[in-house]
Amino acid sequence: MTTFYTVVSWLVILGYWVLIAGVTLRILMKRRAVPSAMAWLLIIYILPLVGIIAYLSVGELHLGKRRAERARAMWPSTAKWLNDLKACKHIFAQENSSVASSLFKLCERRQGIAGVKGNQLQLLTDSDDVMQALIRDIQLARHNIEMVFYIWQPGGMADQVAESLMAAARRGIHCRLMLDSAGSVAFFRSPWAAMMRNAGIEVVEALKVNLMRVFLRRMDLRQHRKMVMIDNYIAYTGSMNMVDPRFFKQDAGVGQWVDLMARMEGPVATAMGIVYSCDWEIETGKRILPPSPDVNIMPFEQASGHTIHTIASGPGFPEDLIHQALLTATYAAREYLIMTTPYFVPSDDLLHAICTAAQRGVDVSIILPRKNDSLLVGWASRAFFSELLAAGVKIYQFEGGLLHTKSVLVDGELSLVGTVNLDMRSLWLNFEITLVIDDTGFGADLAAVQDDYISRSRLLDARLWVKRPLWQRITERLFYFFSPLL
């Protein structure tokens, strides 16, 4: 019996080390950033069982077998649709400004289509204005409405949007609603999901959270887009979830969330529509390719129209494109660069690009919320401040609530707005969307919004920052080490 237990013990020990060696080899064989690989290896060696379980759960990008098969199957038809769209030459911009040229070329070569022109674009910074505009557009819809949000939180004006959407479905408008399972858990636990389905709305719970399948798909891979398309002509996107800030996370101690949304009319709605159709097919298996733009109903040739490129990320979409776009935009800056984000945990490449811009004379400003709803990200962000300040970057800490706007403005002409945070999760993992706008008029509008944020912020003093307590420095470095995993 003693011999039996001895053999079993040695087999367990051998299996234990084989498992660690196997996971180590898997990490080393994956083409990932060195800091990320080192962080995972350290966790596995310090807390082997916890580290191995964590890595197998969230260490690699698993979309799930069924969704991955759908993603592969949809691309032939999607590629054909994009190729057919190129025949609509009147919607594509032939030239771009000098500051935007490189970025638009990158997007065209990676995604297969050029930026689209002739769009009307409006910035909305007040949640009530967003909701009211959306309700009006829903009430005037004639054919179809598609929506996707990370969070839909019942309460306040979000309920009025829900009522208007159900009314549209009852009068024959084809309505589709896709919501992230984790972000919209309150919605799916409320009566609203059943009420909408009973009204005729197709409601899809995207990327369902299921602990039984934790090793088959990454549970932290989320549908983070916020998009609305109406009649293939009107579109919305930006940082705002379908929530009323007066009711959302009031106990978090960070104040009301401050967001920005863009309302558009024109062919950009078609470009966003193909992104939605891909998401819908990956999640449901149903193909809903949007129609090509109709020149008879869309004012493409208006002189005041904006040129917009749509960048989508996530499994099944061009890998690393949003990260490349941010790097390209940063290196294109010659005069000034302003960034706003609630979560700042940049890649080494992006951090160096930002610092280099400041060191070559560009006026670089980053606006972050002073109080953050994520303790981990809040501390990790602070670990980058010293390097940024030393390079000459101005860091503004917003004090008017949780600044949730994601925006980049380069030289007053090139703008990026959308759902992408400047953190690892948005850059490498989630389903995200960003608009790239080449227009001085829109740049002036965005600059006014960012100036308002700065007026409600406190400029971080580099001299005081270096005098912060030792315990804060230690905490920052601890979270900085794990920043590649956040």
UniProtKB/Swiss-Prot annotation:
Catalytic activity: 2 a 1,2-diacyl-sn-glycero-3-phospho-(1'-sn-glycerol) = a cardiolipin + glycerol
Signal peptide: none
EC number: 2.7.8.-
CDD domains: PLDc_EcCLS_like_1, PLDc_EcCLS_like_2
NCBIfam families xrefs: bac_cardiolipin (TIGR04265)
Stated family: Belongs to the phospholipase D family. Cardiolipin synthase subfamily. ClsA sub-subfamily.
Protein known as: Cardiolipin synthase A
Organism name: Salmonella arizonae (strain ATCC BAA-731 / CDC346-86 / RSK2980)
